[in-house]
From Swiss-Prot:
Subcellular location: Cytoplasm
Name of the protein: D-alanine--D-alanine ligase
Function: Cell wall formation.
Reactions this protein catalyses: 2 D-alanine + ATP = D-alanyl-D-alanine + ADP + phosphate + H(+)
Length: 337
Protein backbone atom coordinates (compact mmCIF):
# COMPACT_ATOMS: atom_id res chain seq x y z
CA UNK A 1 0.00 0.00 0.00
CA UNK A 2 1.47 3.35 -1.03
CA UNK A 3 2.04 5.99 1.60
CA UNK A 4 0.10 9.24 1.81
CA UNK A 5 2.29 12.19 0.82
CA UNK A 6 1.56 14.62 3.64
CA UNK A 7 2.76 18.21 3.56
CA UNK A 8 3.33 19.60 7.06
CA UNK A 9 3.22 23.34 6.47
CA UNK A 10 4.35 25.55 9.35
CA UNK A 11 5.55 29.06 10.18
CA UNK A 12 3.52 31.83 8.58
CA UNK A 13 3.64 35.59 8.74
CA UNK A 14 2.25 36.34 12.20
CA UNK A 15 3.81 37.08 15.58
CA UNK A 16 3.18 33.40 16.38
CA UNK A 17 5.57 32.13 13.69
CA UNK A 18 7.99 30.51 16.13
CA UNK A 19 5.16 28.94 18.16
CA UNK A 20 3.92 27.35 14.95
CA UNK A 21 7.31 25.71 14.50
CA UNK A 22 7.09 24.27 18.01
CA UNK A 23 3.62 22.87 17.29
CA UNK A 24 4.90 21.38 14.03
CA UNK A 25 7.52 19.46 16.02
CA UNK A 26 4.72 17.69 17.91
CA UNK A 27 2.80 16.90 14.72
CA UNK A 28 5.96 15.63 13.05
CA UNK A 29 6.75 13.34 15.98
CA UNK A 30 3.17 12.05 16.11
CA UNK A 31 2.99 11.39 12.36
CA UNK A 32 6.32 9.54 12.47
CA UNK A 33 4.68 6.91 14.70
CA UNK A 34 2.50 5.82 11.78
CA UNK A 35 3.76 4.01 8.69
CA UNK A 36 0.93 5.45 6.59
CA UNK A 37 2.53 8.81 5.90
CA UNK A 38 5.47 10.18 3.98
CA UNK A 39 5.90 13.61 5.57
CA UNK A 40 7.57 16.64 4.02
CA UNK A 41 7.97 19.56 6.43
CA UNK A 42 7.98 22.97 4.77
CA UNK A 43 8.29 26.31 6.53
CA UNK A 44 6.48 29.36 5.20
CA UNK A 45 8.65 32.26 6.29
CA UNK A 46 7.51 35.74 7.27
CA UNK A 47 8.06 36.96 3.70
CA UNK A 48 5.88 34.28 2.10
CA UNK A 49 8.74 32.07 0.89
CA UNK A 50 8.63 28.27 1.21
CA UNK A 51 11.63 26.28 2.43
CA UNK A 52 12.00 22.62 3.39
CA UNK A 53 13.52 21.49 6.68
CA UNK A 54 16.63 20.59 4.66
CA UNK A 55 16.90 24.22 3.52
CA UNK A 56 15.66 23.77 -0.06
CA UNK A 57 13.72 26.71 -1.51
CA UNK A 58 10.45 25.52 -3.00
CA UNK A 59 6.83 26.41 -3.70
CA UNK A 60 3.41 24.78 -3.50
CA UNK A 61 1.98 24.83 -7.01
CA UNK A 62 -1.59 24.91 -8.30
CA UNK A 63 -1.06 21.34 -9.52
CA UNK A 64 -0.75 20.23 -5.88
CA UNK A 65 2.95 19.51 -5.76
CA UNK A 66 6.04 20.91 -4.10
CA UNK A 67 8.36 22.19 -6.81
CA UNK A 68 11.97 22.95 -5.90
CA UNK A 69 14.00 25.93 -7.05
CA UNK A 70 16.76 23.44 -7.81
CA UNK A 71 15.20 21.98 -10.96
CA UNK A 72 17.33 18.85 -10.67
CA UNK A 73 15.11 17.79 -7.76
CA UNK A 74 11.95 15.87 -8.66
CA UNK A 75 8.67 17.64 -7.76
CA UNK A 76 6.91 16.11 -4.76
CA UNK A 77 3.15 15.43 -5.25
CA UNK A 78 0.99 16.40 -2.25
CA UNK A 79 -1.97 14.23 -1.24
CA UNK A 80 -2.86 16.09 1.95
CA UNK A 81 -1.70 19.11 3.94
CA UNK A 82 -1.66 19.99 7.62
CA UNK A 83 -1.49 23.82 7.85
CA UNK A 84 0.19 24.03 11.26
CA UNK A 85 0.15 27.82 11.22
CA UNK A 86 -1.01 29.93 14.16
CA UNK A 87 -2.30 33.34 13.13
CA UNK A 88 -1.89 34.57 9.53
CA UNK A 89 -2.38 32.94 7.03
CA UNK A 90 -3.52 29.76 8.78
CA UNK A 91 -6.07 30.54 11.47
CA UNK A 92 -7.26 33.56 9.50
CA UNK A 93 -8.71 31.26 6.82
CA UNK A 94 -6.58 32.67 4.00
CA UNK A 95 -4.53 29.60 3.20
CA UNK A 96 -7.59 27.33 3.41
CA UNK A 97 -9.17 29.36 0.61
CA UNK A 98 -6.15 28.59 -1.55
CA UNK A 99 -6.34 24.88 -0.72
CA UNK A 100 -10.01 24.90 -1.69
CA UNK A 101 -9.15 26.62 -4.96
CA UNK A 102 -6.61 23.96 -5.97
CA UNK A 103 -8.74 21.14 -4.48
CA UNK A 104 -6.11 20.04 -1.98
CA UNK A 105 -7.56 18.24 1.08
CA UNK A 106 -6.42 19.73 4.38
CA UNK A 107 -6.63 19.20 8.12
CA UNK A 108 -8.58 21.58 10.33
CA UNK A 109 -11.37 24.10 10.09
CA UNK A 110 -12.45 25.47 6.74
CA UNK A 111 -11.85 29.01 5.57
CA UNK A 112 -15.05 30.73 6.73
CA UNK A 113 -15.11 29.09 10.16
CA UNK A 114 -11.44 29.97 10.70
CA UNK A 115 -12.01 33.60 9.73
CA UNK A 116 -15.14 33.94 11.87
CA UNK A 117 -13.38 32.62 14.96
CA UNK A 118 -10.11 34.49 14.47
CA UNK A 119 -11.79 37.89 14.37
CA UNK A 120 -12.81 38.46 17.99
CA UNK A 121 -15.63 40.84 17.03
CA UNK A 122 -17.19 38.49 14.48
CA UNK A 123 -16.81 35.58 16.90
CA UNK A 124 -18.66 37.38 19.69
CA UNK A 125 -21.51 38.21 17.32
CA UNK A 126 -21.76 34.50 16.53
CA UNK A 127 -21.66 33.54 20.23
CA UNK A 128 -24.55 35.88 20.96
CA UNK A 129 -26.53 34.69 17.92
CA UNK A 130 -26.12 31.10 19.13
CA UNK A 131 -27.33 32.05 22.60
CA UNK A 132 -24.01 31.38 24.33
CA UNK A 133 -23.16 33.86 27.13
CA UNK A 134 -19.97 35.88 26.58
CA UNK A 135 -18.24 38.93 28.04
CA UNK A 136 -19.67 42.48 27.63
CA UNK A 137 -17.77 44.42 24.95
CA UNK A 138 -17.63 47.29 22.50
CA UNK A 139 -15.66 47.40 19.27
CA UNK A 140 -13.77 50.17 17.50
CA UNK A 141 -12.84 50.57 13.83
CA UNK A 142 -10.36 53.44 13.97
CA UNK A 143 -8.00 55.17 16.37
CA UNK A 144 -9.39 58.65 16.98
CA UNK A 145 -10.75 60.87 19.75
CA UNK A 146 -14.15 59.16 19.56
CA UNK A 147 -12.54 55.76 20.14
CA UNK A 148 -10.61 57.09 23.14
CA UNK A 149 -13.82 58.57 24.57
CA UNK A 150 -15.77 55.34 24.09
CA UNK A 151 -13.03 53.36 25.78
CA UNK A 152 -12.83 55.83 28.66
CA UNK A 153 -16.60 55.44 29.13
CA UNK A 154 -16.31 51.64 29.13
CA UNK A 155 -13.50 51.80 31.70
CA UNK A 156 -15.56 54.10 33.94
CA UNK A 157 -18.55 51.75 33.66
CA UNK A 158 -16.72 48.45 34.12
CA UNK A 159 -13.83 49.47 36.37
CA UNK A 160 -11.27 47.43 34.45
CA UNK A 161 -11.04 46.48 30.77
CA UNK A 162 -9.10 44.46 28.24
CA UNK A 163 -8.17 46.17 25.00
CA UNK A 164 -7.47 43.63 22.26
CA UNK A 165 -6.45 43.72 18.63
CA UNK A 166 -9.39 41.96 17.00
CA UNK A 167 -7.34 39.67 14.76
CA UNK A 168 -4.44 38.30 16.78
CA UNK A 169 -3.85 35.17 18.82
CA UNK A 170 -1.78 34.06 21.83
CA UNK A 171 -2.61 37.31 23.66
CA UNK A 172 -0.65 39.33 21.08
CA UNK A 173 -1.91 42.94 21.06
CA UNK A 174 -3.86 42.36 24.28
CA UNK A 175 -3.68 44.82 27.19
CA UNK A 176 -5.30 45.01 30.61
CA UNK A 177 -6.19 48.61 31.52
CA UNK A 178 -7.14 49.96 34.95
CA UNK A 179 -5.86 53.53 34.56
CA UNK A 180 -7.66 56.00 32.26
CA UNK A 181 -4.37 57.79 31.58
CA UNK A 182 -3.15 54.70 29.70
CA UNK A 183 -6.14 54.34 27.39
CA UNK A 184 -4.85 56.38 24.44
CA UNK A 185 -1.44 54.70 24.39
CA UNK A 186 -2.90 51.20 24.67
CA UNK A 187 -5.42 51.85 21.89
CA UNK A 188 -2.65 53.11 19.63
CA UNK A 189 -0.63 49.96 20.30
CA UNK A 190 -3.62 47.66 19.72
CA UNK A 191 -4.47 49.34 16.41
CA UNK A 192 -0.88 48.69 15.38
CA UNK A 193 -1.72 44.98 15.33
CA UNK A 194 -5.13 45.05 13.63
CA UNK A 195 -7.57 47.45 11.91
CA UNK A 196 -10.27 46.65 14.48
CA UNK A 197 -10.05 46.66 18.27
CA UNK A 198 -12.36 45.11 20.84
CA UNK A 199 -12.75 46.44 24.39
CA UNK A 200 -14.04 43.91 26.91
CA UNK A 201 -15.07 44.10 30.53
CA UNK A 202 -12.49 42.45 32.78
CA UNK A 203 -13.99 39.33 34.30
CA UNK A 204 -12.57 38.04 37.58
CA UNK A 205 -12.87 34.37 36.88
CA UNK A 206 -11.17 31.05 36.39
CA UNK A 207 -9.92 30.35 32.86
CA UNK A 208 -11.18 26.96 31.68
CA UNK A 209 -10.45 25.28 28.36
CA UNK A 210 -12.14 22.45 26.50
CA UNK A 211 -10.70 20.43 23.62
CA UNK A 212 -13.45 19.87 21.06
CA UNK A 213 -12.69 17.63 18.10
CA UNK A 214 -14.12 15.06 15.72
CA UNK A 215 -13.37 11.40 16.41
CA UNK A 216 -14.90 8.57 14.40
CA UNK A 217 -17.61 10.86 13.12
CA UNK A 218 -18.61 12.17 16.55
CA UNK A 219 -17.96 15.59 18.08
CA UNK A 220 -16.09 15.07 21.36
CA UNK A 221 -15.75 17.64 24.15
CA UNK A 222 -13.30 16.87 26.94
CA UNK A 223 -13.82 17.80 30.56
CA UNK A 224 -12.53 21.34 31.17
CA UNK A 225 -8.89 21.95 31.94
CA UNK A 226 -7.63 25.12 33.62
CA UNK A 227 -5.00 27.82 33.14
CA UNK A 228 -3.82 29.08 36.52
CA UNK A 229 -1.91 32.38 36.58
CA UNK A 230 -0.72 34.78 39.24
CA UNK A 231 -3.82 36.60 40.53
CA UNK A 232 -2.42 39.98 39.45
CA UNK A 233 -1.71 39.01 35.86
CA UNK A 234 -3.41 37.46 32.87
CA UNK A 235 -2.26 34.75 30.50
CA UNK A 236 0.04 36.85 28.31
CA UNK A 237 2.15 35.65 25.38
CA UNK A 238 5.17 35.56 27.69
CA UNK A 239 3.29 33.66 30.40
CA UNK A 240 2.32 31.05 27.84
CA UNK A 241 5.74 30.41 26.35
CA UNK A 242 8.51 31.77 28.61
CA UNK A 243 10.72 29.16 30.26
CA UNK A 244 10.30 30.90 33.62
CA UNK A 245 6.52 31.24 33.31
CA UNK A 246 4.68 31.13 36.63
CA UNK A 247 1.46 29.98 34.99
CA UNK A 248 0.49 26.35 35.26
CA UNK A 249 -2.07 24.14 33.57
CA UNK A 250 -4.33 21.45 34.96
CA UNK A 251 -5.56 18.99 32.36
CA UNK A 252 -8.64 18.47 34.54
CA UNK A 253 -9.87 21.58 36.38
CA UNK A 254 -10.32 20.97 40.09
CA UNK A 255 -13.41 21.81 42.15
CA UNK A 256 -15.76 22.19 39.19
CA UNK A 257 -19.12 20.53 39.75
CA UNK A 258 -20.40 17.89 37.34
CA UNK A 259 -23.31 20.18 36.47
CA UNK A 260 -21.05 23.12 35.57
CA UNK A 261 -18.66 20.86 33.65
CA UNK A 262 -21.50 19.44 31.57
CA UNK A 263 -22.90 22.91 30.84
CA UNK A 264 -19.48 24.11 29.66
CA UNK A 265 -19.13 21.05 27.42
CA UNK A 266 -22.64 21.59 26.04
CA UNK A 267 -21.82 25.22 25.18
CA UNK A 268 -18.55 24.08 23.58
CA UNK A 269 -20.27 21.53 21.35
CA UNK A 270 -22.98 24.06 20.47
CA UNK A 271 -20.30 26.54 19.39
CA UNK A 272 -18.37 23.89 17.44
CA UNK A 273 -21.44 22.74 15.53
CA UNK A 274 -23.08 26.15 15.20
CA UNK A 275 -19.98 27.80 13.75
CA UNK A 276 -19.30 24.82 11.45
CA UNK A 277 -15.90 23.98 12.92
CA UNK A 278 -14.08 20.90 11.67
CA UNK A 279 -11.61 18.36 13.04
CA UNK A 280 -10.25 20.30 16.03
CA UNK A 281 -10.61 23.34 18.26
CA UNK A 282 -9.89 24.59 21.74
CA UNK A 283 -12.75 26.54 23.26
CA UNK A 284 -12.00 28.81 26.23
CA UNK A 285 -14.40 29.88 28.96
CA UNK A 286 -14.51 32.04 32.07
CA UNK A 287 -16.12 30.67 35.22
CA UNK A 288 -16.93 33.32 37.83
CA UNK A 289 -17.19 32.86 41.59
CA UNK A 290 -20.98 32.86 41.12
CA UNK A 291 -20.70 29.98 38.63
CA UNK A 292 -21.53 32.20 35.67
CA UNK A 293 -20.15 30.65 32.47
CA UNK A 294 -18.90 32.99 29.73
CA UNK A 295 -17.43 31.90 26.40
CA UNK A 296 -14.16 33.76 25.90
CA UNK A 297 -12.75 32.62 22.56
CA UNK A 298 -12.29 29.77 20.10
CA UNK A 299 -8.93 28.66 18.75
CA UNK A 300 -9.34 26.81 15.45
CA UNK A 301 -5.77 25.49 15.36
CA UNK A 302 -4.74 25.17 19.01
CA UNK A 303 -1.08 24.98 19.90
CA UNK A 304 0.68 21.66 20.30
CA UNK A 305 3.76 22.85 22.15
CA UNK A 306 5.08 21.10 25.29
CA UNK A 307 2.81 23.29 27.47
CA UNK A 308 -0.25 23.28 25.22
CA UNK A 309 -3.56 22.00 26.54
CA UNK A 310 -5.21 20.54 23.43
CA UNK A 311 -3.06 17.40 22.97
CA UNK A 312 -2.97 16.80 26.73
CA UNK A 313 -6.75 16.99 27.06
CA UNK A 314 -7.26 14.74 24.03
CA UNK A 315 -4.95 12.11 25.47
CA UNK A 316 -6.50 12.44 28.93
CA UNK A 317 -9.85 11.71 27.26
CA UNK A 318 -8.42 8.36 26.15
CA UNK A 319 -7.53 9.16 22.55
CA UNK A 320 -4.10 8.71 21.01
CA UNK A 321 -2.99 11.74 18.97
CA UNK A 322 -1.44 9.69 16.15
CA UNK A 323 -4.55 7.53 15.84
CA UNK A 324 -6.71 10.65 15.91
CA UNK A 325 -4.76 12.18 13.02
CA UNK A 326 -4.94 8.92 11.05
CA UNK A 327 -8.70 8.67 11.49
CA UNK A 328 -9.28 12.24 10.33
CA UNK A 329 -6.91 12.07 7.35
CA UNK A 330 -8.01 8.65 6.09
CA UNK A 331 -11.67 9.49 6.58
CA UNK A 332 -11.29 12.68 4.59
CA UNK A 333 -9.34 11.08 1.74
CA UNK A 334 -11.78 8.17 1.55
CA UNK A 335 -14.73 10.56 1.35
CA UNK A 336 -12.95 12.56 -1.37
CA UNK A 337 -12.32 9.46 -3.48
Amino acid sequence: MSKINLLLLCGGGSAEHDISLMSANYFETSLAKSEQFSVLRVELDKFGQYRTAAGDDCELTNSREIRFRDESKTPWPVDYVIPCIHGYPGETGDIQSYFNLIQLPYFGCESEASSNCFNKITAKMWFSALGIPNTPYIFLNQFDDAAIEQTQTALAQWGSIFVKAASQGSSVGCYKVDDSAKVAGVLKDAFGYAPYVIVEKTIKARELEVAVYEYNGEVVATVPGEIICDTNTFYTFDEKYAKNSKARTDVVAQHVSAEISEQIRAYAIKAFKGMKLRHLSRIDFFLTADNEILLNEINTFPGSTPISMFPKMLQNHGHDFTEYLSLVINGQLTAKS
